[in-house]
Amino acid sequence: MEKRLQEVLEKRFHKTLDTCTKEELFHALMEITKEATGNLKKNEGSKKLYYISAEFLIGKLLSNNLINLGLYEETEKVLKSHGYELCEIEELEMEPSLGNGGLGRLAACFLDSIATLGLPGDGIGLNYHFGLFQQKFTNHKQQEMKNPWITKESWLNRQSFTCKVPFKDFTMDGVLYDIDVPGYDSGCNRLHLFDVDTIDESIVPENSINFDKKKVQENLTLFLYPDDSDDAGRKLRIYQQYFMVSCGAQLILKEMEDAGYDLHELNNHAVIQINDTHPSMVIPELIRLLTEEKGFTMDEAVEVVSKTCAYTNHTILAEALEKWPMEYLEEVVPNLVPIIKELDERVRKTVKDESTYIIDAQDRVHMAHMDIHYGFSVNGVAALHTEILKNSELKNFYDLYPERFNNKTNGITFRRWLMHCNPMLTRYIESLIGNGFKKDATELEKLLAFKNDEAVLNKLEEIKMEKKLEFKEYMEKTQGLTIDENSIIDVQVKRLHEYKRQQMNALYAIYKYLDIKAGNKPSTPITMIFGAKAAPAYVIAKDIIHLILCLQELIEKDPEVRPYFRVLMIENYNVSKAAKVIPAANISEQISLASKEASGTGNMKFMLNGALTLGTEDGANVEIRDLVGEENIYIFGRKPQDVIDLYEAGTYSSKEIYEEDALIHKLVDFITGEELLAIGDEESLTRLHRELIGKDWFMTLLDTKEYITTKEKVYADYEDRKTWNKKALINIAKAGFFSSDRTIAQYNEEIWKLK
């Protein structure tokens, strides 16, 4: 590595390792890493996976790729010997802005595991220039700005592949960029990202995300999830989705033909995993291409496509199961309309249940319905989630096709979420149980032999303290916020949505503030950390961020409370910031309304790094509890079935709880009390106050009191540090099940059957 670095620095910059700048060193390392991944053998076989997703939240790639190539430690040593720290060099990398939340991060973990297991499988998505948005806090509010991440030199490699995508009023030329995905000590796959050369980045002003949504040829791949609060925004999403699936379908068919396969046997050589409903149009688009360009009859095309496509459902929220008005499709992609109508007609001939039709009475096209009828597999992403799909949300489909439904509990790549973000913990685990866990995560169970070993438990606490100090330094440097490393670090980081209930955590912050003002000081100081972006058009979510930032300001300026309790919000939360905060956390907040979180993967990352979960009986929390035991997790709140029953009965009333419970009344009214109104925006705080009392769709007030009681117990339990550390060790030891390597092995065994 040293010799190669010297060569590249000399050739490119006429510098040496002792005279180059950090920026030059970063570019040299990137070049060497790209070269090394390019030289890896491609994972090949007679059947290939295409994982198609609107999001791939891949994070920074330099360190991740060095780890997977087996070059990380050598690189670290070389840099150290010349006075550099690799972690400082990687700070210079721009984080690719190709995803938003758990959906995109899961896709990234999956690509890592697919490559690591040596399976032939590529990702297909879009090359967003500005991503979701860059978040800035201004006047205690979220401000959205464009997030340009594509630099002159990046991980993107332009390919020769091009294709034509036909819309109603024009045709667009798709171009392809690839990012190499090296497996850990394995071969290499690719992430295919489609783009257009007519994109004009200048149509978006600085410090803004506003642009003319009708100029599709100039704006198509600028943003992930463009604001869909108007017709133009909704149509732009259809343009994006169709462009992605048409380019992807054309690439798939070309690769199959180039390999000499008969397209009538497509399902023997390709499998397409539809990640949530955004890529659903790949089904009618493949049928269109096969019938219009490859000489297939409609029957032949429908049959082979139905045997090739599989669908992953990621949500129980009806709002997230996309339904597009037929008139929009007629205005954007009229080519697909007769095919979708034909697919719906075929369902109507054999199925009497109208709720399962693809086109409903309002002339809306249900994407998930198309995926289920014309795919061979439907999977949920956690045991509880899949049961809810089968028994409630998708029951009518389960009754039709029970054999298609299966569960694949989500997982995370331990390369990024342990080896990369917590090397100190990784090395210590290695010293205790060897390095087998890097390839087989279930070997972490060997740690259970040390659960009563005081020296081991003390060392785990030391490592946690080191990570807290690193996080403290990072927050001071990036946001000017100081953190007490001796405090309990209590973290809720995830996209902002009412069902995830950041607002309930904020109500607890109000409770704690008032409690300390009343003279009840906690034994150990508490630092509550939030990190979240709210969708630009999601008003209440932005109001919740406003409330949290107002509480932060209130407490920071209160000398009575600040030494004992802090509320801090991470600005522009992303993968890089997750890698800083997760290893520092003592408590992992997973407090969604039971039955609403499909799985969650943050819960797994925190567990792996020795944080204890405070959560509801929801998503993968249930499986964490089953693995670690009731005594090593803190579960509170209504059970999933109780919540489902309440929705069905329509009897939940937050107003009743507010009026009858003095404590809840006091906490909710504090939102519009004089302390916060002196800091915040009255309209925003009043709207949130009104929402909690008048609607509270995700039943915040129902669980608030039990949440407060349970959280107080968690803080009290932290005082017995030996028992706490034992619980942390048990969580780490039992985290092996949540490796995405296990998830992918199950997908392959039961769905993909790659060869």
Enumerate the predicted regions with their spans.
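A conserved ligand/cofactor-binding region detector
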Residues: 1-755
